[in-house]
Structures are given as C-alpha cells and as structure tokens.
Amino acid sequence: MRINPTTSGPMISTLEEKNLGRIVQIIGPVLDALFPPGKMPNIYNALVVKGRAGQQINVTCEVQQLLGNNRVRAVAMSATDGLMRGMEVIDTGAPLSVPVGGATLGRIFNVLGEPVDNLGPVDTRTTSPIHRSAPAFIQLDTKLSIFETGIKVVDLLAPYRRGGKIGLFGGAGVGKTVLIMELINNIAKAHGGVSVFGGVGERTREGNDLYIEMKESGVINEKNIAESKVALVYGQMNEPPGARMRVGLTALTMAEYFRDVNEQDVLLFIDNIFRFVQAGSEVSALLGRMPSAVGYQPTLSTEMGSLQERITSTKEGSITSIQAVYVPADDLTDPAPATTFAHLDATTVLSRGLAAKGIYPAVDPLDSTSTMLQPGIVGEEHYETAQKVKQTSQRYKELQDIIAILGLDELSEEDRLTVARARKIERFLSQPFFVAEVFTGSPGKYVGLAETIRGFQLILSGELDSLPEQAFYLVGNIDEATAKAMNLEVENKLKK
C-alpha cells in the first residue's frame, strides 16, 4: 500500500528521474520497448506511453517478458490505436497501483483504477499495487466457520465458508444478479461488511444493468455515495486481453484493503472466472508461449493459484469470494473449469426448472454442494436436518415420473406423505429478498441459521402436515408460514 501526497493524476509513482525507453515493435495489444543498458524495468512494472503535444494518447502497459538485448515485451491495458515505433515509453518503476479504501465505494472503475462513471475524480492518496503475494501462513485464520448469509437454502444445504470460495453456476434469467445483490445487501446489514464486484470480460449491457439495479435497491446510495456498500470494477468484453486478465486483480486489491486495513468481512464477486482464464490464454499466445492442453496457456494453474490464494481469511478479516463459472460446452473436464473447481469450497447451482415454478432463489437443493456440510463443522443437528431435506427432495424427484403418468392416488400412503412434505420444503426454500421488494411488494426477510433449522425440522417431523403448501411460499421463518396459513383459512371462510 502507498500513501500518495496529493490527490491528482493517475496512479503512477513520481517520475522526476524518468527511465525512458522507446517502442521498437507493436503487434496488436503487445508491444516491445528498448531501454538503455542497465535500466531494464522489472517484470509487472507499469509502462506509460504518451503521445506528442496535441495527441490524445495515454496507454498503460505491463511488462510481461524480458527479451534480452535491453528489450522488454509488455501487454497494453487499453487500445493501442495511434501508437508508433519510436514513441517514448516511461517506466513508472512500480507495478500498476489502484485507489483503495472508502473512496472506492459506490464508484465504477476500470482496470487502471480510473473512475468511469462520470461522477468526478476519486481520492487517490491511498493506492495499492495489484500484484502482491498471498498472506503468509502465520497470518491465516485456520478456524472453520460458517459465513451466514440469511438465505435459508444456502445456509442449510450448501453453507458458505468464511473466507472461502464459492462457484455460482446459472444461465441467463434464473436470478443470478438478484442473488448477488441480496448477498451484498445482507453482508452490509448483518456483518457491517462491504462488497467488491469484478466484472471480468463482462458484457457492457450486463454491467450497466447491475449498476442501475444496485442504485434502485439502495446498495449504491446515490444521495450519499460514501454510504454505498459496494465498489465495482469492470473490464468489458471489448477491452484488450491485458485489461480483462488484470481486472480481477484490481477488484481483489480493493477487497484486500478492506480486509487488512479496515479489518472487515468482504464479499468479492468475480463474473466470470472463465473469462479471466480466457484472457490469460490470449495474452499467452500473443507473447509467443507454446500452448498447453486444449490450447490453454501453460501457466494456467499458476495464474489461477496466484489469484485464488490471495482470497482467504486472515486474523484481521476475511474475503469470501463468489465466482460465476462458465463451463464451455458443458464439459466439466475442460482445463479452465477443472482448474477452478480445485479451489472451490462450495457450489451454488441455480435451476431453470425452479425459476420457472416461481421459486426464488432458484437454488437447486440437490446439485448445490459444500465442503462445510459435515457434522464436525456445522454440528449434528444442522447436518441431520440438511440430509433429511435432501433425502425427501430426492425421493420426490424419483416419484415425479410416476405422478406424471399415474397420478398421486397410485402412490403408497408413505410416498404421498413424502411428496406433500417435499412440496412444502420446496416452497419453504423460497424467500422474499430485500433487493426484490420493489418488484414483489413483499418485505425482504433475513433468516438466521437456528431459525432455518427449526423450520425444516418442524416440516420433516410432520407437525405442520395439516397446513396448506401455499402457506410456506415466500415467507421468512416458520412462524410466518403458520401465520400465513391462519390468514389463508380466514380468507377461505370469508369467501364461503
């Protein structure tokens, strides 16, 4: 971390004694620069190319290779239009640094840490380099603890680990964005924490939609930006591969400051982790490296590891990361998702079938998994309840074909009871969200883990068999379901 004396200008160290080179070759987003003997920049140093007087050129590059003969190869973080051989290159003497701290909340940044939301400059007195080592072993918090989200289906069936990494699998229109926003909202209210969203290879439209929805739901406070609970960092699809490869590190650097200096629990979203690998593959090819399996970069595991190992819990705070994972051609053995899976502690799978039924969040209770769901970690009561919920849901799934062909009446008494309870469980796994209040008209609910376990135990025990299944739909805790059942009964009597 660096404390800069002034708030002006981009994140570049003082250039009184400029180390100057010149461009000798440009191949798309990659350029070679020649420096004087003995003045070679280090790997990962930021280089700046400025145009002559009157030219609107200001391109930042990152040194990737030392070629010998005083030449370096660098990857540009923005378009290289207008660059020519012979142009002057300034070695900043340090890696790319970005603004960190409270000034970043409520704002949108690019990979260089420059605001792109037309809301004026950002305080850059405190900056931090995007390249740094992972926390040392002695700094790590090895205690296994659950990260309570207040979302019933997540906390019960696939609990998140504090400082863990979660893979979020879901297609378009199944509620991924709303789930992300609810998690941001809940961590702000329940844990007093902040969130950082890294859009890696994000569609510009999706990024814009997310920003607008965050403003509408109050996650970003337009009237008082400082009270916002999220910082956004975007490297869109149209950006050069260098920007898409490094934007994840920019977001992570901002999150690390909140963890290490402010000692907060931070939520880090990366959408999409596959595009981080894809950008690395493009850069690797441009640098002339021999490709590895399926055309990926030979450094795939190293690049993924250097990003993922920085996402962890320390004694000061934690970074819990939720990463959207795209699986190419649904092939889980593809090197990109396979390398990602090795780092994940939990998977949250969103189901289009549940979304079609109107059950939100549309988290699939059978496909979602977590390494935390062990009796030694969550306790016997939680573990047993979760297993019974899964067994009941699994049995219902097996019986659906029979029900479709022969109907419910052909089932045994025991199976009919299982189906009735499974349908109540399915509906009770739904929940009204705070960020969706504007659309649903129902006030959002945060449900504690103890309340969640109690609710499902009551359904499984058969104590609530007499209640109609619609009483369990879109409620918070089980007491609300009981109250809703009484209201439905009163309404039915009035109708008669």
UniProtKB/Swiss-Prot annotation:
Cite the EC number.
Answer: 7.1.2.2
Domain of life according to the entry: Eukaryota
- Where ATP is bound, by residue? 170-177
Instruction: Give the matching PROSITE patterns.
Output: ATPASE_ALPHA_BETA (PS00152)
Show the catalytic activity: ATP + H2O + 4 H(+)(in) = ADP + phosphate + 5 H(+)(out)
* Group of enzyme by EC: translocase
CDD domains per record: ATP-synt_F1_beta_C, ATP-synt_F1_beta_N, F1-ATPase_beta_CD
Return the InterPro entries for the record.
AAA+_ATPase (IPR003593), ATP-synt_VA_C (IPR055190), ATP_synth_F1_bsu (IPR005722), ATPase_a/bsu_AS (IPR020003), ATPase_alpha/beta_chains (IPR050053), ATPase_F1/V1/A1_a/bsu_N (IPR004100), ATPase_F1/V1/A1_a/bsu_N_sf (IPR036121), ATPase_F1/V1/A1_a/bsu_nucl-bd (IPR000194)
Membrane topology per the entry is: Peripheral membrane protein
MF (Gene Ontology): ATP binding; ATP hydrolysis activity; proton-transporting ATP synthase activity, rotational mechanism
Q: Where in the cell is it found?
A: Plastid, Chloroplast thylakoid membrane
Which Pfam family, any one, appears in the UniProt record?
A: ATP-synt_ab
Ordered alphabetically, the record's keywords are: ATP synthesis, ATP-binding, CF(1), Chloroplast, Hydrogen ion transport, Ion transport, Membrane, Nucleotide-binding, Plastid, Thylakoid, Translocase, Transport
Q: Which GO terms describe its biological process?
A: proton motive force-driven mitochondrial ATP synthesis
Q: For this UniProt entry, what is the primary localization, expressed as one broad class?
A: plastid
Q: Name one GO cellular component term.
A: proton-transporting ATP synthase complex
Function description = Produces ATP from ADP in the presence of a proton gradient across the membrane. The catalytic sites are hosted primarily by the beta subunits.
Similarity section: Belongs to the ATPase alpha/beta chains family.
Q: Which NCBIfam families match?
A: atpD
PANTHER family from the UniProt entry: ATP SYNTHASE (PTHR15184), ATP SYNTHASE SUBUNIT BETA, MITOCHONDRIAL (PTHR15184:SF71)
Q: Which HAMAP family match?
A: ATP_synth_beta_bact
Q: How does it assemble?
A: F-type ATPases have 2 components, CF(1) - the catalytic core - and CF(0) - the membrane proton channel. CF(1) has five subunits: alpha(3), beta(3), gamma(1), delta(1), epsilon(1). CF(0) has four main subunits: a(1), b(1), b'(1) and c(9-12).
This chain's protein is named: ATP synthase subunit beta, chloroplastic
User: What is the scientific name of the source organism?
Assistant: Dioscorea elephantipes (Elephant's foot yam)
